[in-house]
Amino acid sequence: MSGHTPYVIDSQQAHRLLQQIDVPQILRKLFRDLAAGQAVQPAQQLVEFPQGAGDFINYLGVLADDQVYGVKTSPYIVREQGPLVTAWTLLMSMQTGQPLLLCDAGELTTARTAATTAVAVDALTPLDAKRLAIVGSGPVAQAHLHYARGLRDWQDISLYSPNVNADKRARLNDIEPRLRIVEHLEHALEDADVILLCTSSATPVIDPSQLRKPALITSISTNAVRAHEVPPQALNDMQVYCDYRKTTPGSAGEMLIAASQHGWDAGQIHGDLAELLSEQTPRPTYARHVFFRSIGLGLEDIALANALYHLHHKAS
């Protein structure tokens, strides 16, 4: 193989290789590197297609310790039968300027999204938390369950989704046999200490003001413009954390709306993962709800692509 030709890893191969690496630990190192100035995370780049045909988002990142940089590009293509979303990551060498890896990033995106949430839950949740709730049932929700199920001594793990078919139910119970799949959202949220929102919804799926006690609520991104899983005005009543304070407020839908319409300011963010993992910011008090928002960082994609590259390189 020419030194100028990158390895190409398809979705099935990526899935297999991901089982061989400790994704949360790779991400913890990444955020500590970011805090120490050994990594660079530019803002996401959103480019809209003409005539409302969709868009694509570029996620960039530089890992100086590993001497690599790269980009994940993910299109959102509008179609009559529903939108099409794909993602590919290109890993480049900072030493030779040559491409190292081209990887179908679908599996990587799912893994890093869920593992980032798990890292946040571990950093933000009280050690005595007992009840975990998950909203959603697709591959991202399944990955969240996989990475979060062992973080605390959960006495109850419940999941709500309006779309749990027999196949999803079997997959979820294979991941965690103790899982309770409930028919009503309020049954999952009741007395929950941690609530993981794992949907592709562009509009709120829960109202934190309706919860009976303070909880950690985590939320992820989808490609829809200004997508948000909680009401934007709720940010004013929560302790807000995010994956990276320099980029998240400029992309997260509820933060953009809260800033423009509800008097919220990004300066109210209590901390990000780089600060939490380097102990530059304290853990929350839980006098009120805690909200963790991730948009997904290019650095996460690059770090996992780099780990897969080294696994593949070693095997070959």
Q: Each PLM stretch: what is its role?
A:
Residues M1-T110, A118, D128, I302, ...:
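N-terminal ligand-binding/catalytic initiation module
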Residues S137-G138:
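Glycine-rich Rossmann-fold phosphate-binding loop(s) that bind the pyrophosphate
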Residues G150-D174:
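NAD(P)-binding Rossmann-fold cofactor-contacting core
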Residues L132-A133, V290:
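Conserved beta-strand elements of the Class I
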Residues I175-Q261:
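Rossmann-like adenosine-cofactor binding region
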Residues L124-R131, D153, R212-K213:
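Short helix-loop-beta connector
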Residues A141-Q142:
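N-terminal Rossmann-fold NAD(P) dinucleotide-binding loop
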